[in-house]
């Protein structure tokens, strides 16, 4: 017997056009984007589908990702695609909570909007940095 789990990505997986084919095909997806806009005041559809720099700003990326993930999840649920588990990487954990029924989409929009704002404020543009350490030994990692 096969089991299915949904894994939701975190920030960094966003790209212009994400979710567009679902948005164009399903009324329910458009409703998710409308709800996100009502809760946050952000035109999430424009954010996702039009070329812009805002999609790469934490303050906006997070609501765009969460909305897209939950809208697609809804389509999968409506199609009767069963799943036994949901998990997420960082931001994706919120979509996983929604998939599990622990967080409503509307409440999630509220939380994610604030999360994005606070994270953006914590590290203003041009300050701070991040590095990925790949294929180093433990000793080399300690030296870094």
Region roles according to the model:
Residues 69, 84, 88-92, 96, ...:
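Gly/Ala-rich beta-loop-alpha elbow adjacent to hydrolase catalytic centers
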Residues 52-53, 87-91, 116, 128-132:
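Short, glycine/charge-rich beta-strand/loop segments that flank catalytic centers
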Residues 75-79, 97-103:
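Alpha-helix C-terminal capping segments
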Residues 11-13, 38-40, 100-144:
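Alpha/beta catalytic cores of group-transfer enzymes, especially the acyltransferase/condensing modules
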Residues 65, 72, 93-96, 110, ...:
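Hydrophobic side chains within alpha-helical segments
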Residues 2-87, 136:
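Helix-rich "cap/lid" substructures immediately adjacent to catalytic or cofactor-binding pockets
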Residues 31, 64, 90-91, 103, ...:
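An amphipathic alpha-helix/helix-turn recognition signal
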């Amino acid at each position: 017997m096969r089991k299915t789990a949904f894994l939701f990505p975190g920030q960094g997986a966003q790209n212009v056009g994400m979710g567009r084919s679902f948005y164009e095909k399903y009324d329910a997806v458009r409703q998710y984007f409308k709800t996100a806009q009502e809760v946050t005041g952000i035109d999430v559809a424009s954010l996702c589908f039009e070329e812009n720099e805002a999609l790469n700003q934490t303050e906006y990326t997070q609501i765009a990702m969460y909305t897209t993930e939950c809208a697609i999840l809804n389509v999968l649920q409506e199609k009767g695609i069963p799943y036994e588990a949901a998990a997420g990487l960082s931001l994706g954990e919120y979509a996983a909570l929604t998939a599990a029924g622990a967080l409503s989409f509307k409440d999630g929009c509220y939380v994610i909007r604030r999360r994005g704002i606070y994270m953006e404020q914590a590290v203003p543009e041009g300050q701070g940095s991040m590095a990925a350490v790949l294929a180093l030994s433990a000793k080399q990692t300690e030296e870094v």
